[in-house]
Amino acid sequence: MPLRASEHAYRPLGPGTPPVRARLPAAAWVGVGTIIGGVVIIAALVLVPSRASWALSPCDSGWHEFNLGCISWDPTPMEHEQAVGGCSAPATLIPRAAAKQLAAVARVQSARSSGYWWVSGDGIRARLRLVDGVGGIDQFCEEPALRICYYPRSPGGFVQFVTSTRNALGLP
């Protein structure tokens, strides 16, 4: 017995609904576009400029670059009170660690120097002997010494992020 087409035809279980198209709302597209745009802008800022453009700002006139700071000095030996008051803000007397580094460089240039430098001692008299980097505090600091003023320069957080990213990527 032959089958009729109407007997075995497909019959849906429920009323038919048109297929729903998945669409993102406009706010989601704006959010995704903003995120992608931000990533592209940061990538362009990190990758396009050279490393030199992310360097520290230059020292002021009359100051000399030293590591991440700037130094200025007076070649005339003076008393501690005069030395402390002679550095213009934001500079202070050179910190002990920076003074030791500078003394190491200065010893290379003049091994016979026996002078002293006043160093930042957090309110106490402190100085550093140039020849060997040995320091003295209070009663051992009666003689005049040279004043070396110092102010640090530090790159901002974004500059540190950029330079560390460039280092991680091996970019010059």
Curated annotation (Swiss-Prot):
Keyword annotations from UniProtKB, A to Z: Membrane, Signal-anchor, Transmembrane, Transmembrane helix, Viral envelope protein, Virion
The protein's role, per its UniProt record: Important virulence factor of HSV neurotropism. Seems to be required for glycoprotein B-induced fusion. Dispensable for growth in vitro.
Protein name as it appears in the record: Envelope protein UL45
Keyword Transmembrane attributed: yes
Intravirion side: 1-27
SS bonds (residue pairs): none
Subcellular location: Virion membrane
Gene Ontology cellular component terms for the protein in this record: membrane; viral envelope; virion membrane
Family indicated by similarity: Belongs to the herpesviridae HHV-1 UL45 family.
Domain of life: Viruses
